């Protein structure tokens, strides 16, 4: 595994890739996730980073080999992407494009909240992960008037079945729940949570009304 080229990445592209590694930690083991959350992103240890990239590659390789046609466990790799793709699409439509990994990181915030309320994901691990995202990725800003637009974008995600929004959620780190759904009210509640915990209410036009 050749990781020397990681040194050439600017900060934004580094964090974009790191978001996928964070996802791998969430679908792997508590130890793997803890290492990712503890990594010093301001003073990068490239030797340690190389070993962490290797672990991420192993996680993805194991899943893809087990389910090459994505009929089952490979859907675990979609964690954070259902909402993340909607954020990407909205950002592009508004001519404020974002890197894929940033959208995934923000999507993880939303989908960990769904995991917390629907499948019992531990609140402390949700909060730890959200804090890491908040500190390293900032936030994607939107207001409540855009909830319907985001919802419609999510309905058109290629991973859906028969028009039903499909989520990959977690009961615990590494305990994956595939093919999960949520009604519109719950999804809007998820957006409320995201905007509150990420500080978006401070920057959007409807803040005074809420």
Language model segments and positions:
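Generic alpha-helical structural context detector
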Residues: 19-24, 54, 131, 152
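Active-site segments that bind and position negatively charged phosphate/pyrophosphate groups
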Residues: 34-148
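Catalytic, metal-anchored helix/loop core of enzyme active sites in primary metabolism
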Residues: 66-68, 91, 187-199
């Amino acid at each position: 595994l050749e990781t020397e080229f990681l040194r050439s990445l600017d900060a934004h592209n580094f964090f974009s890739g790191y978001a996928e590694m964070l996802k791998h930690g969430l679908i792997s083991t508590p130890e793997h996730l803890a290492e990712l959350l503890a990594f010093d992103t301001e003073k990068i240890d490239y030797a340690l980073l190389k070993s962490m990239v290797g672990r991420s590659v192993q996680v993805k390789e194991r899943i893809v080999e087990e389910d090459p046609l994505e009929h089952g466990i490979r859907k675990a790799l979609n964690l954070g992407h259902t909402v993340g793709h909607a954020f990407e699409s909205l950002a592009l439509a508004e001519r404020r494009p974002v890197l894929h990994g940033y959208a995934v990181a923000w999507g993880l915030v939303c989908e960990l909240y769904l995991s917390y309320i629907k499948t019992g994901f531990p609140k402390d691990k949700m909060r730890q992960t959200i804090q890491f995202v908040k500190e390293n990725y900032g936030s994607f800003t939107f207001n409540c008037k855009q909830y319907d637009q985001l919802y419609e974008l999510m309905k058109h995600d290629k991973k859906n079945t028969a028009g039903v929004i499909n989520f990959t959620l977690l009961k615990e780190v590494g305990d994956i729940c595939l093919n999960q759904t949520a009604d519109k009210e719950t999804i809007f509640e998820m957006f409320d949570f995201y905007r509150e915990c990420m500080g978006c209410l401070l920057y959007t036009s409807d803040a005074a009304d809420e």
